[in-house]
Amino acid sequence: MRLNARDLRALWDLPRLRAAACGYFGHMWELYAFWAVVPALCLTIAASPANPAPALWSGWLAATVIGAGALGCIVGGYLARRMGSARVACAALGGSGLICLVYPLLPESMSGLRLAALLLWGVLVVADSPQFSALSAQAAPPQLLGLALVLQNGIGFLISVISIVLLSALMDFWGARALWLLAPGPLLGLWAMRGQLGRSRPCFNKED
């Protein structure tokens, strides 16, 4: 497949595809950077005088937080069949963005609350991913579908590399407050999707 400016312009000129792709980019700014620092966040929770093996427990906690995303994807898929992918994607993106803003404000002494917030964050942070992919697949013309998804995923992972590097560096200086670096992703993603909620339909209905 040849990449040419005409195809790129044709894809960018599709409002629904542009909104879904930009929403996905905001999601990718947050997702992998969050996963990258989950072990460090869990180690802070597990580190206490009463815990003789904080490293071991933090590993189990981190795996649980990241694995909780599977539940988010399953529930998100179920809800998308009734509410539409755009609504589910925006709800998950907004929820994870809200936790991103609130989590650094939680006292370190409230380890149970912090763990609950991380688990909920783990559920929400990835639940929008398949929905954005579905929205893009529905919006792209068949002859450019492969190109649209390749570009969306490639740009998304490039964005992830940047956010991972920045967040990992800032965590050493700011601790949990560095998580605020992730907030622009969900916020910009929601802004990009602002005109799509009214058009969201259940997935079992044929799109226009």
Stretch-by-stretch model annotation:
Residues 16-70, 74:
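Extracytoplasmic gate region of multi-pass secondary transporters
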Residues 1-22:
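Juxtamembrane intracellular "pre-TM" segments in multi-pass secondary transporters
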Residues 104-107, 176-208:
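Multi-pass alpha-helical transporter architecture, strongest
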